[in-house]
Amino acid sequence: MTNIRKSHPLIKIINHSFIDLPAPSNISAWWNFGSLLGVCLMLQIITGLFLAMHYTADTTTAFSSVTHICRDVNYGWLIRYLHANGASMFFIFLYLHIGRGIYYGSFTFMETWNIGVLLLFAVMATAFMGYVLPWGQMSFWGATVITNLLSAIPYIGPNLVEWIWGGFSVDKATLTRFFAFHFILPFIITAMVMIHLLFLHETGSNNPSGLNSDSDKIPFHPYYTIKDILGLLFMVLTLMTLVLFSPDLLGDPDNYTPANPLNTPPHIKPEWYFLFAYAILRSIPNKLGGVLALVFSILILMLFPLLQMSKQRSMSFRPLSQCLLWVLVANLIILTWIGGQPVEHPFIMIGQLASVIYFSIILIFMPIISLMENKLLKW
C-alpha cells in the first residue's frame, strides 16, 4: 500500500511543495523570508478577519469602532496592533526577500520574478487602503493626496479620481470601497502566491553560488522546515516585542485624531515602508513626472532580468557589484529618511540627488560594473 502522503490527490500536492521538495543543500538564512512572508500573510488575514467583525466602514463610526476594538473587545488591542505591526514586518521581509533576489541573481527566473513584482504592487495597494480605514487625520489626508495623483493622467485623470472617490472628495463612498478592496485583495494575493510558488517549483530554488544544484539536492523536510521554524521564532519574538512594548513606534500620532476635512496636518506622509517611493515622488516638481517616477521606482524591478550583463548569476564572487548594491541599500535608507522630512531646504536637494542616484545605479552603473567584472575575468 502506498503512503497516503504520496497517493492522495490533495496531500500529494502539499507533499511535492513542502515535504519531498528537492532543495539545494547550501541555501542560507536569506531563503527563510519566503516562508516568513507566507506566515505574515496568514497572520494578516486572520487578524484582519477578526478586526472586520467589529469594524464599521462608515465615516461617522469608523474611528470610534477602532477605539471600541482597542478598549472593549477581548484582546482587541492585541489583534489591532498585531495587524498594524504585522504589516510592517510583512514589508521588512518583502524588501529583504527582494534584496536577496537581486544579490543572488534569482531574477533570472523571469516568471517567478515578475509575478513577485506584481505581488509587491498588490501588497502595497492593500497596505495603502488598510491605512485609510481607521479614518484618522493621516488616513484621510493620505487617501486624498495619493488618490489625487491619478488626476495627473492626461485627459481622463480628473474623471478617474472622482470615479475612485465615488463623489467630489474622499468621503463615505471612498471608505466603503476601500474596506471592500482591503478585504478581498489578500485573498487575491494568496492566489498569486500560489502561482509564484508554482513557477518557482518549475525551476527549483536558486542558491548562494548561483550555480546549478541539480546534482546536490536534499529534501525540504526536515532540513528546511526546521530552519524555517527558527526564522519564525525570531519573527514572533520581534513582532511581539514591538506589539507589547511600543505598538505605536512605527505609526503616526496624527492618526489618533479623527479625520477632519477642514484641517490639514502640517506634514502629510504615508507609513514608513512607502517613504522611499514618496521621496522619489516629491523630488520631481512636475505632477505627472512625479507619478511616473513613483510607479517606475517599483516597476524598475521588472527590468533586472534584462539589465543582467554579468556572466555570473550570483553576486557572491563579484565584489564590485556587491559594493554597488550596498550603496543602493544606503541610498534607499536615505530616501526613506527624506520621505519623512518636511519639504524644505536641504531635504529637497538631498531627495532629488538620492532619486537620481537610485535610478542611475540600477539602469547605468550596475550593468557597466557587471561588464567590467566580465573583462576582469577575461570573459
Swiss-Prot record:
Q: Which keywords appear in this protein's UniProt record, sorted alphabetically?
A: Electron transport, Heme, Iron, Membrane, Metal-binding, Mitochondrion, Mitochondrion inner membrane, Respiratory chain, Transmembrane, Transmembrane helix, Transport, Ubiquinone
Which Gene3D superfamilies did the record assign?
Cytochrome Bc1 Complex, Chain C
The entry marks the following residues as binding heme b b566, namely 97, 196
Instruction: Please indicate which superkingdom the organism of origin belongs to.
Output: Eukaryota
Q: Matching Pfam families, A to Z?
A: Cytochrom_B_C (PF00032), Cytochrome_B (PF00033)
Per the similarity annotation, which family is this? Belongs to the cytochrome b family.
- Native source organism of the sequence: Octodontomys gliroides
Miscellaneous comment in the UniProt entry for this protein: Heme 1 (or BL or b562) is low-potential and absorbs at about 562 nm, and heme 2 (or BH or b566) is high-potential and absorbs at about 566 nm.
Q: Which InterPro entries match?
A: Cyt_b/b6_C, Cyt_b/b6_C_sf, Cyt_b/b6_N, Cytb/b6-like_sf, Cytochrome_b, Cytochrome_b_C_euk/bac, Cytochrome_b_N_euk/bac, Di-haem_cyt_TM
Cofactors (names):
heme b
* Co-factor: note: Binds 2 heme b groups non-covalently.
Is the keyword Lipoprotein assigned to this protein?
Answer: no
What is the protein name given in its UniProt record? Cytochrome b
What is the documented function of this protein?
A: Component of the ubiquinol-cytochrome c reductase complex (complex III or cytochrome b-c1 complex) that is part of the mitochondrial respiratory chain. The b-c1 complex mediates electron transfer from ubiquinol to cytochrome c. Contributes to the generation of a proton gradient across the mitochondrial membrane that is then used for ATP synthesis.
Task: Write out the GO MF terms.
Answer: metal ion binding; ubiquinol-cytochrome-c reductase activity
Q: Which residues bind heme b b562?
A: 83, 182
- Which PROSITE patterns does this entry report, sorted A to Z? CYTB_CTER, CYTB_NTER
PANTHER family given for it? CYTOCHROME B
